[in-house]
Amino acid sequence: MSWQAYVDDHLMCDIEDHEGHRLTAAAIVGHDGSVWAQSATFPQFKPEEMNGIMTDFNEPGHLAPTGLHLGGTKYMVIQGEAGAVIRGKKGSGGITIKKTGQALVFGIYEEPVTPGQCNMVVKRLGDYLLEQGL
């Protein structure tokens, strides 16, 4: 299966029991900032934004004072899982980032998708990639 198929079939799919509800954007990005696959709507990010995200995984709390920036959009960092998941909120939407051994799985959402639904979709694929040694 191609990386693009993982994004299309496992991240940008309808959310379980909520037909028509799906993430706004999603991507799988290597720890080095290289894009493995992304939805057409995933924002163009700057290298320093990815560096900040990777630093927060290694030093939890790094982004809390300044916020998480992706594609020029600022998200307020909310409780995640230290070293494993970063969550951000902006208005009625937000972002979840799950770290695997080699990649970061991104999910961006807006209402009517809930933070919990975004977390579930991103975590499910991230956990699968971890099980596969990725």
UniProtKB/Swiss-Prot annotation:
A motif (Involved in PIP2 interaction) lies at residues 84-100. Pfam families: Profilin (PF00235). Keywords: Actin-binding, Allergen, Cytoplasm, Cytoskeleton, Disulfide bond, Phosphoprotein. Phosphorylated by MAP kinases. One of its GO terms (cellular component) is cytoskeleton. The modification Phosphothreonine is found at residue 114. Gene3D superfamilies: Dynein light chain 2a, cytoplasmic. Its main location: cytoplasm. Disulfide bonds join 13-118. It is found in: Cytoplasm, Cytoskeleton. InterPro entries: PFN, PFN_euk, PFN_sf, Profilin_CS. One of its GO terms (molecular function) is actin monomer binding. PROSITE patterns: PROFILIN. It comes from the Eukaryota. The variability of the residues taking part of IgE-binding epitopes might be responsible of the difference in cross-reactivity among olive pollen cultivars, and between distantly related pollen species, leading to a variable range of allergy reactions among atopic patients. Belongs to the profilin family. Binds to actin and affects the structure of the cytoskeleton. At high concentrations, profilin prevents the polymerization of actin, whereas it enhances it at low concentrations. Occurs in many kinds of cells as a complex with monomeric actin in a 1:1 ratio. This is Profilin-2. It comes from Olea europaea (Common olive).
